[in-house]
Amino acid sequence: MSFFTLMALAVALGTDALSLSVGIGLTGISRRRILQISATVLLFHIFMPLTGWLVGEFTGSLIGRAAAVIGSLLLVGLGVKMIWAAWRNGGETEPSLVRFNFWGLLLLGASVSMDALSAGFTLGTRQVNLLLAAGVIGLVAGAMTAGGLVFGRFLGSRVGERAQLLGGLILVGIGIKLFF
């Protein structure tokens, strides 16, 4: 696999994380939280292709579907909560809505890296340095996540009171997309 092909794969696998992170960043987020979320996504995007390669397609598809359903429900729930808070409070942001604890970070990382699990099955059948591929995929996804969070934070400061509503709508949309 050429480096260009690997980079294209990495960018494609990072797009869910990018779009989700813009939605999260819209409500305002600290630098520390940006690092935590980006590192979580990075690690999951390294771990999942390796898991896909090691575990095999059948077991991975069962685990992957359950994690995708849980992750998508989490995103829809968070998005609905943000929309409700924006509606109820006239658009005032509540950063506590996007504070992720340990389990929340794990679910977030799993929900946006299911495609990387599937990619691991394919990479395992090719003549490719799997550790290098997983590392590149993880680094690109982590960088895309950080960029999305920073952009979302910037955009949220410009959009003002509608940022929470917009962020909630984005999260609901991504959650629904990940479900199907």
UniProtKB/Swiss-Prot annotation:
MF (Gene Ontology): manganese ion transmembrane transporter activity
Similarity field: Belongs to the MntP (TC 9.B.29) family.
Purpose: Probably functions as a manganese efflux pump.
Stretches of the chain forming a coiled coil according to its record: none
Name of this protein: Putative manganese efflux pump MntP
Organism: Pelotomaculum thermopropionicum (strain DSM 13744 / JCM 10971 / SI)
Keywords: Cell membrane, Ion transport, Manganese, Membrane, Transmembrane, Transmembrane helix, Transport
Subcellular location: Cell membrane
InterPro entries in alphabetical order: Mntp/YtaF, Put_MntP
A Pfam family matched in the record: Mntp
Membrane topology: Multi-pass membrane protein
TM helices/strands, residue ranges: 6-26, 34-54, 67-87, 102-122, 131-151, 160-180
GO cellular component terms listed in the entry, alphabetical order: plasma membrane
